[in-house]
Amino acid sequence: MLRPRVSVTVDPFTRIATVRYVGAINGDVIIPEVLRLYGALERPWEYDCIWDMRRHTGRTETRDNEALARGWQAICGGRDIGRYTAIVSDDALIGARLPLTQRLFPFRTLAVFATVEMARAWLETARADTEAPSVA
């Protein structure tokens, strides 16, 4: 049995924050903890995110996503415009909820992946596409 836990790890060089929640933990516990940990980062709006939910066996509901969106907005205040969030899950409901979740986070681009490797590859490609030098 997995010990329920929430973690946020940060790579300051790649500017990627990885959020993981593991075990039978529900959204009413996950969301406040994620917001506390993410909010403690210096300039958190400068990070792209990977949300790794592969070992999550609890439940999150639409109201949890809405609470996360409100807290996220309070922390980032729209300064995360153009950032990316890769969600890693094999739960079909996560993919089905993506259009609703995307509307809750209008400044970020969200996508769902089966593996962390696929999520990282998407982030690298998306970043390369948006960081191309402009012609003056």
Task: Mark where each language-model region is.
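Amphipathic, Lys/Arg-enriched alpha-helical "gate/interface" segment within cytosolic domains
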Residues: 1-136
